[in-house]
């Protein structure tokens, strides 16, 4: 594995690295682990610890999207580009870290549904409320950005651009909370 060789992409970070360098294109994605290569019969793009570096790029994209920047809005909609390129999958599951950072926001705003893990404690209950407030705020900001984009470029040009790059124009059809899973602790004897 050579991280500088774009032909040996093995993790999701390898795709985001192009974005960090200014390219918002998620076309021609090869899945490193295909369903016929494992007993679980799933395809997988592994994560990478360096993916957190992309959060700065995404944070900048959030700000620039509010002013109608075309490249920025494409970056925020990376997940839709990924979905468009991989139409053979029934589901795409994304496991994000426990953060309200810009990368996770972009994943949540472009996911059809999401669920959260919880422990049986007060902090989990407070966290769910916090996530709900943040998501509502993000959705409002994103909707305002779409309106700014349309007023800046006009309805027809915006429609073509949104279609071409799979831009989410209605966050009310995405980002739906479907529930939680409870994590239970088990005691082990050693």
Predicted regions and their residues:
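P-loop NTP-binding core
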Residues: 1-190
């Amino acid at each position: 594995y050579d991280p500088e060789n774009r032909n040996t992409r093995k993790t999701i970070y390898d795709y985001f690295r192009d974005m960090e360098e200014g390219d918002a294109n998620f076309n021609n994605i090869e899945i490193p682990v295909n369903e016929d290569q494992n007993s679980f019969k799933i395809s997988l793009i592994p994560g990478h610890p360096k993916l957190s570096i992309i959060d700065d790029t995404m944070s900048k994209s959030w700000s620039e999207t509010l002013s109608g920047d075309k490249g920025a809005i494409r970056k925020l909609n990376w997940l839709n580009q990924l979905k468009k390129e991989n139409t053979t999958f029934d589901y795409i599951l994304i496991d994000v870290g426990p953060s309200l950072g810009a990368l996770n926001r972009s994943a949540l705003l472009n996911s059809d549904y999401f669920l959260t893990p919880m422990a049986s404690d007060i902090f989990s209950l407070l966290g769910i409320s916090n996530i709900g407030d943040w998501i509502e705020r993000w959705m409002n900001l994103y909707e305002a950005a779409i309106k700014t984009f349309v007023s800046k470029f006009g309805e027809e040009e915006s429609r073509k651009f949104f279609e071409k790059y799979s831009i989410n124009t209605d966050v009310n059809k995405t980002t739906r909370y479907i529930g939680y899973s409870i994590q239970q602790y088990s005691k082990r004897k050693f």
